[in-house]
Regions:
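Hydrophobic h-region of N-terminal signal peptides that target proteins for export
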Residues: 8-19
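Gly/Pro-biased beta-strand-loop elements
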Residues: 205-334
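Extracellular LysM carbohydrate-binding repeats and other cell-envelope/extracellular binding modules
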Residues: 90-136, 174-211
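Secretory/export targeting leaders with adjacent low-complexity proregions
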Residues: 151-243, 265
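Compositionally biased, proline/threonine/alanine/serine-rich low-complexity intrinsically disordered stretches
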Residues: 18-63, 67, 125-127, 247-251
Length: 374
């Protein structure tokens, strides 16, 4: 059973832009843990549409402010581009592909999504003030050894720069690039810096919570694609994409529709090949601020031992700020302490997402959903 701790520290952050401020975040839903039954039968997976077609062509890829604008737009619409850095790479291309799929555009089109991004994100940057809560959520002395971490109250951020970069869905080098002349590692409370104009991720607003089944969200289907490092979430029964005359199969389709069955997609880091458990499982529990059971034997061999440490909750926990366990014992989706490594490094066996993406999952899926790992 996962152990949890109640962390209910709230503080505000003033974020503002010269023309338009970053929007305030949606309320964070709540969750508690439940043990998954590894012997529970898996539900049959509903049919789901796949993201077919070529990735958007390189020649249409935006640069400069437009690149940041596009990444913010995709991020805010649940098509995660990875970290916001103004350098659209493969994850941004996959997010554009997903957005095009949903909206009925050619898979390799950049024009439609950029037009939408320019309308939705007129100002890609905002000015943010470092909140007073950093005094409780930044610990420069956070140890690296698991035995010492087990003695801590919380797995906090190691610097204000890390706190602010995760808050605004980017990494520290990009934050430094946006703020030339500022000593990004010497920030203090009430300092102001330029940040991507995204809805901020408020780690300090999270509390020990649990999520129950939901009639709509529990019927959805999660596809974890370990070949392209992406998780996609579908409605239980996607709508027909092509409307045609069944009595005249040789006739051209009447129309092509957007795939409204695709709900969201996010970049992931899958587990090491020897630990990946392919198949279809059930989402059993969703836990915010989980304590992590550090079992060296389990991580190295896949076999659970009785010699383990309990690592406290927090944004720098190896499982991040949320655990979404499946009916396959020990396998689940979770956050991470290193968002910049998503898609670039293997985890021990689970599916890692950036904390700002992982915490959105309870707004999209709930216990009872199927999780297909392929």
């Amino acid at each position: 059973m996962l152990r949890l701790t109640l962390l209910a520290v709230f503080s505000g952050l003033t974020a503002f832009a010269a023309a338009q401020p970053a929007p305030e975040p949606n309320p964070v839903l709540k969750a508690l843990p439940a043990e998954g039954d590894p012997n529970a039968p898996s539900k049959a997976a509903p049919a789901t549409a796949s993201l077919d077609g070529p990735l958007p062509a390189a020649e249409g890829k935006p640069t400069g402010d437009d690149a940041v604008r596009l990444q913010i737009f995709l991020d805010q619409n649940h098509f995660g581009p990875g970290i916001v850095d103004g350098k659209p790479g493969r994850f941004t291309e996959l997010a554009v592909l997903a957005w095009n799929e949903v909206n009925g555009h050619p898979s390799d089109d950049w024009h439609a999504v950029m037009e939408a991004a320019r309308k939705a994100v007129p100002n890609p940057f905002a000015t943010a003030v470092v909140p007073d809560s950093v005094k409780d959520w930044v610990d420069p002395g956070l140890p690296t050894s698991r035995s010492e971490q087990a003695k801590k109250k919380r797995m906090s951020y190691r610097s204000i720069a890390e706190f602010m970069s995760e808050r605004y869905h980017c990494d520290v080098p990009y934050l430094a690039a946006l703020n030339p002349g500022k000593k990004i590692y010497s920030l203090k409370a009430r300092d102001s810096i330029v940040v991507p104009n995204v809805t901020p991720f408020h780690a300090e607003a999270l509390v020990e919570t649990k999520f129950e089944a939901d009639p709509t969200m529990s019927a959805r289907h999660v596809v974890v694609d370990t070949k392209i490092n992406q998780v996609r979430i579908f409605e239980a029964t996607p709508v027909a994409l092509v409307v045609a005359d069944p009595d005249n199969p040789n006739a051209a389709p009447v129309s092509r529709r957007g795939n409204k069955g695709l709900v969201a997609s996010f970049p992931i880091t899958p587990g090491k090949p020897q630990f990946i458990r392919f198949g279809t499982w059930e989402l059993k529990n969703m836990v915010v601020l989980p304590w992590w059971r550090y079992d060296e034997s389990l991580l190295k061999t896949g076999k659970r031992s009785s010699n383990a440490l309990m690592i406290p909750a927090g944004p720098n926990s190896p499982v991040g700020v949320i655990w979404c366990g499946t009916s396959r014992s020990g396998i689940g989706m979770h956050g991470t302490s290193d968002p910049e490594t998503i898609g670039r490094a293997r985890s021990a066996g689970c599916i890692r997402l950036a904390n700002w993406d992982a915490i959105r999952l309870p707004n999209i899926v709930r216990p009872g959903s199927t999780v297909e790992i392929r």
